[in-house]
């Protein structure tokens, strides 16, 4: 591919966000957007710099990231494990899946009052909510991926004399990976959404806490900064997942085509 075309393709997704930021800055400079409603990007960048210098932004960012990753690991591991179990075992699916589907239909954020009763307002409550939020996307997509592996490939593996372990590692798991990665990308979005809400539950640290404290003092620039940080974290998490997709699914013709197109 032409290097100039390649550079343009990489820059293309950023044109609309850049245009919106420029429009936002111009509108603020002309007085069309009052600072108390939506501060200018330059004001948000200034407060970000100030918060970085005093250490509060890196500290809160680190706390939020640790909470998000802890919830993702806990909820993701359980969801992945149960997805495999129910996908590989008809008995497991009949025994567990109906109950899990009933729980799935209850919005996990609606459980906040009950979670506070169970865990109080400490870290356990926030981790539980994040873990529950990421559990179902990963569980459902793992189950779907395992169930939709081509039966002919499984049969061929058996004909070649693969034992159950080899069949799982060489055929079933690779065949389920595209669906699992879809679940991971969806789970990451739910993870940050849940964390925003969870950090408003009497938290004393984290980006959500920083936003809530700023709201009390009508510091709109800090609130906007917090929202932008969540958006950036979400984008970075999604990009990391796409990178892993390209790495682990290079054998898949669909992903090979996408990679070649770039």
Which functions belong to the PLM regions below?
Residues 2-4, 30-73:
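Periplasmic/extracellular loop-to-transmembrane helix junction in inner-membrane transport proteins
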